[in-house]
Amino acid sequence: MATLFIADLHLCSEEPAITAGFLRFLAGTAREADALYILGDLFEAWIGDDDPEPLHREIAAALRALVQSGVPCYFIHGNRDFLLGRRFARESGMQLLPEEQVLDLYGRRVLIMHGDTLCTDDAGYQAFRAKVHKPWLQTLFLALPLRLRRRIAARMRAGSKASNSQKDLAIMDVNPQAVVDTMERQQVQWLIHGHTHRPAVHTLEANGKPAHRVVLGAWHSEGSMVKVTPDNVELVAFPF
């Protein structure tokens, strides 16, 4: 009996080893879970559900096979794949969740999220996020020809990489007060998120009691997951 959480795989055709590792995970470890939650940035980029990229079809088929085996799969958007929509969700069998979701896991109230909204010290990113999450702008972008969307996305990724290389690493991590405020607003003692690529289990105080923040690692040279059971919450790194 276990519920699994993953995030930040950044799947793309240029990283076939990560894709292969994820497919093995879906066909193996994930089949034993009560449920699988993907907390954003499953893909390196997402320019629309109508993108015919073969990788997307391959991943959708593998996720659907997991769901059809009896393991429900849930998805929270990340900062890379926030345009992933209902069409892909139907194709893959995933259920889309809001950016903050509270779960009752074996008697624990656990808040799950991607985590980028906690990085409030990075004012430039938060302003950009607010802009690209405007529904009218998303509708306009998705109406553009695929070729143009690809060019825009590539330019934005290059700009993001250049910008991040100039930023202090500290401002790209979560703001501690934002974490406490979010946990107290949701009345939880457990938070699981990704985004920062800094896997760790942090202890803090929220709601006047000890609390825990579990940060998922990115899938680079190895996989990362959080395994929640009735007795334990464990951050696990594993080979592909």
From Swiss-Prot:
Mn(2+) 1 binds at D8, H10, D41, H197. GO terms for biological process: lipid A biosynthetic process. Binds 2 Mn(2+) ions per subunit in a binuclear metal center. It comes from the Bacteria. One of its GO terms (cellular component) is extrinsic component of plasma membrane. InterPro entries: Calcineurin-like_PHP_ApaH (IPR004843), LpxH-like (IPR043461), Metallo-depent_PP-like (IPR029052), UDP-diacylglucosamine_Hdrlase (IPR010138). It holds the Pfam family Metallophos. Its cofactor is Mn(2+). Substrate binds at N79, R80, D122, S160, N164, K167, H195. Pathway: Glycolipid biosynthesis; lipid IV(A) biosynthesis; lipid IV(A) from (3R)-3-hydroxytetradecanoyl-[acyl-carrier-protein] and UDP-N-acetyl-alpha-D-glucosamine: step 4/6. Its EC number is 3.6.1.54. One of its GO terms (molecular function) is manganese ion binding. Hydrolyzes the pyrophosphate bond of UDP-2,3-diacylglucosamine to yield 2,3-diacylglucosamine 1-phosphate (lipid X) and UMP by catalyzing the attack of water at the alpha-P atom. Involved in the biosynthesis of lipid A, a phosphorylated glycolipid that anchors the lipopolysaccharide to the outer membrane of the cell. This is UDP-2,3-diacylglucosamine hydrolase. It comes from Cronobacter sakazakii (strain ATCC BAA-894).
